[in-house]
């Protein structure tokens, strides 16, 4: 039996994208043991995992915040006698852990982050943009370089485990018509469709009697906005701040479609096999972060010569007007959602 240490410390969407690959690899090698090193709050994503996958939390905001703390963690991990390290992050902390193992003769295989190619993709115009190798494929490349061949067998977190229908009923009631999820927020402003325009999307969708909307977001300001939108409209429910991540994943698995930004919610939908319509602004699917198993045809975006200007959506707009988002009409988004549902165009 070989033992593999897998490292991916953040961010939530990137960790979510590792799951289809890790589960597929683990199922292809049932005689081996796999340990995933990630932040404690992200371990909840790994539900219904193969029996040969275990999780170790690394507190990057506490005991493992400093480089010395990371090295001490690595020294403790060496006692587990891993045969290889698969670094799916390739940042200072993960490289420090890998270096400790390399000093002990353990081979380390690292993700190609394609930094130079990403810089070219997000440069100011004039430029020619080309799709980079998808991140999920690059994750797979690392495992194959480590000698772990596999086929993609992952379908959904719930493929072999039924969702508790009582939980769904308690959260959402009895299903009538279409259930559509909407997650209008993201970590950075360059990924967020303007709230006034998104509210128009909510108006148009909630005006259809065959659609019930479920709004997803975080606590605090996001919850306040979503609660206000839901209170003012029929057949609109705010789920923000009310349920655990696992409960939300169960409900997402029952949606007919999920309208998202380029955010973690998009990847959550991919993990449970739910179709997604996504809205892209400063970022672009060509950067490789499109969700596992989903069709890029469902990405709504404006063809501007300045796009993409950022890999993560965290840079200011060169133009100053966020045209990449503001030029996307709410009616265009609604039309795509309804088309995806198989209904009549609004």
Residue ranges and their predicted role:
Residues 1-346:
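Catalytic machinery of carbohydrate-active enzymes
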